Design a protein with these regions (language model features):
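Post-Walker A helix-loop "phosphate-sensing" segment adjacent to the P-loop in P-loop NTPases
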Residues: 17-26
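Small-molecule kinase domains that catalyze NTP-dependent phosphoryl transfer to phosphate-bearing small molecules
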Residues: 125-171, 176
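Hydrophobic anchor at the beta1->P-loop junction of P-loop NTPases
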Residues: 1
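Conserved phosphate-donor/acceptor-positioning beta-strand/loop module used by diverse small-molecule
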Residues: 85-89, 98-123
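ATP-binding Walker
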Residues: 6-7
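The feature captures the helix immediately C-terminal to the Walker
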Residues: 13-14
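Walker A/P-loop
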Residues: 10
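ATP-dependent small-molecule kinase phosphotransfer cores
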Residues: 30-84, 91
Length: 177
């Protein structure tokens, strides 16, 4: 799953993982500071040096520099029988799609830029950071839509999670038929 900041990716993923025992989240690494109130396990928070060493060791499926912080998905090692969920930026989604054309990409958008702005402020982002994220979202949206298998607008969490569950179930049936 990919989408700009403030669309609710983490909240959606948490709900999906709780609902579907056959999903496994590959926890992303980041060098950014943990936000106030953010769960300890939202990411694996590491230093830039640790992150760069992991890059050197070939330990990431994909990684990107996003607004001065590094984000990366460690090479997944899902338990047997589980489908891996990646919660990644658009740059990372492009890398994953290049590596695995069969990877399913669901791109999530906010109902409006105003709502996105409100969500970003609500999680404690500064005005400057919010403006950077909104500009980045404008730039990423056409790319995300172009590479996505599905595009969803998260205007209601329960509906979005239900729709994602239906998509995952449908894709599993297609894969197994």
């Amino acid at each position: 799953m990919s989408g700009p900041g403030g669309v609710g990716k983490s909240t959606i993923v948490d709900a999906l993982i709780e609902r579907d025992a056959n999903l496994w989240l590959s926890r992303s690494w980041t060098t950014r500071e943990r936000r106030q109130g953010e769960k300890q396990d939202a990411y694996k928070f590491v230093t830039r040096e640790q992150f760069e060493q992991h890059i050197s060791d070939g330990g990431f499926l994909e990684w990107t520099d996003f607004l001065g912080n590094l984000y990366g998905t460690p090479t997944p090692s899902a338990p047997s029988g589980k489908d891996t969920v990646l919660e990644i930026e658009v740059d990372g989604a492009q890398q994953v799609k290049r590596l695995n054309h069969q990877a399913l990409l669901i791109f999530v958008l906010p109902p409006s830029r105003q709502e996105q702005k409100s969500r970003l402020h609500g999680r404690g982002d500064s005005d400057q950071k919010v403006e950077k994220r909104l500009q980045k979202a404008e730039d990423e949206e056409p790319v995300g839509k172009a590479i996505a298998d599905y595009v969803l607008i998260n205007d209601d969490l329960a509906s979005t999670v239900d729709e994602m569950s239906r998509i995952i179930d449908y894709e599993r049936k297609q894969r197994n038929s």
